[in-house]
Amino acid sequence: MTYEKHPEHQKLVRKILPRLEIGNGMDFFPIGEPNTKLGDANYKGHFVHAFNFKFKDGVSNDEIAELMNELADLKGKIPVLKELVVGKNEAHWHRGFQYGQISVFDKKEDLMTYDKHPEHQKFVRKIIPKLAGGNTMDFIPIGT
């Protein structure tokens, strides 16, 4: 049985939807290491940064793929980045967001180090002109 159709998930959806002003789904297969899974032990006790990408009309699929692969390649270049998964959005409730990124850090302050890192800044300068929008969420996982 899929997660989406599981009775417990359906029960939660029925409870949340009436209270939800707006939502955005992000389901994807990671670019790069196929065995990377959220929820693994190495995620516990960390700080998570998630970002959804919506590209402008006219940005080709090849350009998008190149940018997302470049983002995925940051994993080995920025020491504070403990985990990075990037992938194409597979959610049916995507609100136009085509790709997503989930980054994991040891602590919240490491996100600022990542944000200011020259490799990240170089990527940001390259991708910003191509984006129609983005959505970010930074959090400490529940239960850690």
Question: Which residues does each PLM region occupy?
Answer:
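Short S/T/G/P-rich N-terminal loop/turn motif that feeds into the first structured element of a domain
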Residues: 1-10, 21-99, 106-116, 121, ...
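Terminal edge beta-strands and adjacent linker/stalk segments
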Residues: 16-17
